[in-house]
Regions:
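Glycine-rich Rossmann-fold phosphate-binding loop(s) that bind the pyrophosphate
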Residues: 8
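N-terminal Rossmann-fold NAD(P) dinucleotide-binding loop
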Residues: 12-13
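NAD(P)-binding Rossmann-fold cofactor-contacting core
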Residues: 21-41
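Short acidic-hydrophobic, aromatic-tinged amphipathic segments that line or gate anion-handling sites
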Residues: 42-47
Length: 62
């Protein structure tokens, strides 16, 4: 399952870490973040990139 996180503050980073460490069947594929904070290739500041991606199964607001 591929998910997208909306936000990458304290909660978003924690969710990403837990999924990487403990949930092998789930991948954080996209992350919505502010334009000046795009530090990871999974990140975008354009919400439409996430909602139009057919590979995203679940969107999580963090």
């Amino acid at each position: 399952m591929k998910i997208a996180l909306l936000g990458y503050g304290t909660v978003g980073r924690g969710v990403d870490q837990i999924i990487r460490d403990r949930v092998g069947s789930v991948e954080v594929a996209r992350i919505l973040e502010l334009p000046d904070r795009l530090s990871d290739p999974r990140m975008t500041s354009d919400y439409s990139e996430i909602v139009s991606d057919p590979d995203i199964d679940l969107v999580v607001e963090c």
